Amino acid sequence: MARSKTAQPKHSLRKIAVVVATAVSGMSVYAQAAVEPKEDTITVTAAPAPQESAWGPAATIAARQSATGTKTDTPIQKVPQSISVVTAEEMALHQPKSVKEALSYTPGVSVGTRGASNTYDHLIIRGFAAEGQSQNNYLNGLKLQGNFYNDAVIDPYMLERAEIMRGPVSVLYGKSSPGGLLNMVSKRPTTEPLKEVQFKAGTDSLFQTGFDFSDSLDDDGVYSYRLTGLARSANAQQKGSEEQRYAIAPAFTWRPDDKTNFTFLSYFQNEPETGYYGWLPKEGTVEPLPNGKRLPTDFNEGAKNNTYSRNEKMVGYSFDHEFNDTFTVRQNLRFAENKTSQNSVYGYGVCSDPANAYSKQCAALAPADKGHYLARKYVVDDEKLQNFSVDTQLQSKFATGDIDHTLLTGVDFMRMRNDINAWFGYDDSVPLLNLYNPVNTDFDFNAKDPANSGPYRILNKQKQTGVYVQDQAQWDKVLVTLGGRYDWADQESLNRVAGTTDKRDDKQFTWRGGVNYLFDNGVTPYFSYSESFEPSSQVGKDGNIFAPSKGKQYEVGVKYVPEDRPIVVTGAVYNLTKTNNLMADPEGSFFSVEGGEIRARGVEIEAKAALSASVNVVGSYTYTDAEYTTDTTYKGNTPAQVPKHMASLWADYTFFDGPLSGLTLGTGGRYTGSSYGDPANSFKVGSYTVVDALVRYDLARVGMAGSNVALHVNNLFDREYVASCFNTYGCFWGAERQVVATATFRF
């Protein structure tokens, strides 16, 4: 029996009513019992199920609430921007190894930026990636601030939901990529007992075991805990690379009454090996080598002793207190420490590639051999990043006449420090690799020849303070959302080798305005304007860090979220522009200059529906028309890794009657259109379609309620494809067929 969160005398009657209602209807409902003394009967009236929370689980694949777009618990149809939510229920259907894999059926999101590699969750949203190598990913509303190679990742098994907000978001979050962000919500303690153990085995010698335990620590539900963890070991797709991950997430909630909630959240993850993180040339992948052959999809151009490890530690809390019907205060806080270490040899294109024009090894080859010898470089890198973030909000609900307001005021602060101790090998620092007869050997990463390599020791510091205000004002069926934010963003880079320091302090105001019209039938058209800014970490030829880029977006859309059915259908048309993009110096120096512009226009459609207890459907379509509208070199071109068309469709069916009762069958397809492989648009990466499948059996039929066994297959027909390229020397094979058997037991 579920334990109540607070001790109230009337709960005993409610518990009796639940038992009676369950016996009568065969399904659990929340109920209230009324006993009339004149009659020897009990009248049971079913009450609505508890309302979904933006910070908690959703009952189906179609989540109806989100806090990512407003920082308040808001119905999705009331947010004047596009939001997609991948619930734990949907993740359970696919059992993804990474969060980016969990987003494979989400519109507007390119997840193939690194092909089969699971080292990072790098995404391109509406044609834009985060500045540099960093991700634009958040956990519980606070940014997982990364720097250089030091980006944190969260395992999807630890999450309640993963949400994509598309378009500029600086009005709430400060510095950000104009394309949007990923916000993940951690699993939190429950007052109902949860005991889950999971086992996985599959392709590439995958073995994983996980556990998820939660319960109240007292009869009144004041104290509760959750402990989630996993251990995973697998071979990466590329020969010689491995993936190892050990993670645990202890959480504890103190809820003294129904108006106060304090939840301690933590996450500890150790990855002795993060897998493959190299790249391959277009020759042998997109195009055949001179001998007419292509490289195998498990090809690894690195050294045999390549290593790449990461360690993450995060502790923090989420606190909220409702003073009365008007005022609620919330605060999210987290301290994180991330360490990465790598010794990596990586490819840098065949010798005939202009990128290797200064290589002496390549110059010594006969012209006929330059097309099948791969130039390589290396990096030795150790980093330690510390990040502190806190976001404090005051929510005020009140009315002015006929207008209901939800006013949010807040201030957030972020401080990041990343100490980089690296050594880079340049041209000719690693022997060439014959792609006709490749022999991977160990590499001496300690040699560090100053003739062709050098140190890179940098201490990067960043700070951001932002104050913001947002009003969600509703008059009858009209909802107006208006918000503004002012940021102070400071960055400092100390070059320990040269003994120089680069600094830049930026101040920026951004705002968003939107209007929604809420029809009674669940249809909600909307219009919005939003802005973003994103500081640069690069330095110009004058020695100064560049000014931030800025984003502006106009979006028109419609959402359909009926009150009585778990269906969410959204569609949007947008025009998004990024100004002050960096571009090549027209005077021919090796430095970039400011003043570039990229524009993206697009259409996105998404549908998520639990059409019945048996049928789930997820579908999406994306059209993205991205272009360098101002650039000294690439004007009129399309950015690399941005397909014009993407589409996906998934459906699953569960049998509840007959001999197949308890069986779930599912299948889906993901289409990615062709994309350009470099900013010069000198070649294209072909389109591809992959098919996924699911077979799952509910063990309740054999007396094990809540448990199941399943077989998940991604890329069912083992389609060979190049996921994307960012340049002529940087292409990525897509994931091969993955077959994973899963056994989940609840007791």
Swiss-Prot record:
Q: What induces it?
A: Induced 1.6-fold by hydroxyurea.
List the residues marked with site Interaction with phage T5 RBP-pb5.
Answer: P566
GO MF, one example? toxic substance binding
Origin superkingdom: Bacteria
List residues of the TBDR beta-barrel domain: 192-747
Residues that bind ferrichrome, according to the entry? R114, Q133, F148, Y149, Y277, G278, W279, Y346, G347, Y348, F424, A735
| Motif position, TonB C-terminal box | 730-747
Q: Where are the transmembrane segments?
A: 193-201, 207-215, 223-231, 246-255, 260-268, 313-321, 327-335, 388-396, 405-413, 465-473, 478-486, 509-517, 523-531, 552-560, 566-574, 602-610, 614-622, 646-654, 662-670, 690-698, 706-714, 738-746
| Keywords per UniProt | Cell outer membrane, Disulfide bond, Ion transport, Iron, Iron transport, Membrane, Receptor, Signal, TonB box, Transmembrane, Transmembrane beta strand, Transport
* Notes on how activity is controlled: Binding of ferrichrome or colicin M enhances the interaction between FhuA and TonB. TonB activates FhuA through interaction with the beta-barrel.
Instruction: Show the SUPFAM superfamilies listed in the entry.
Output: Porins
Q: Which cysteines are joined by disulfide bonds?
A: C351-C362, C725-C731
Cellular component terms, GO, for this chain's entry?
cell outer membrane; membrane; transmembrane transporter complex
Question: Record's Gene3D superfamilies?
Answer: TonB-dependent receptor, beta-barrel domain, TonB-dependent receptor, plug domain
Q: What does this protein do?
A: Involved in the uptake of iron in complex with ferrichrome, a hydroxamate-type siderophore. Binds and transports ferrichrome-iron across the outer membrane. In addition to its role in ferrichrome-iron transport, transports the antibiotic albomycin, which is a structural analog of ferrichrome, and acts as a receptor for colicin M, microcin J25 and bacteriophages T1, T5, phi80 and UC-1. The energy source, which is required for all FhuA functions except infection by phage T5, is provided by the inner membrane TonB system.
Cite the record's note on assembly.
Answer: Monomer. Interacts with TonB. Interacts with Escherichia phage T5 receptor-binding protein pb5 (RBP-pb5); this interaction is necessary for the entry of the viral genome into the host cell.
Q: Member of which family?
A: Belongs to the TonB-dependent receptor family.
Q: Which PANTHER family match?
A: FERRICHROME IRON RECEPTOR-RELATED, FERRICHROME OUTER MEMBRANE TRANSPORTER_PHAGE RECEPTOR
Output this protein's name: Ferrichrome outer membrane transporter/phage receptor
Organism the protein comes from: Escherichia coli (strain K12)
The gene name reads fhuA
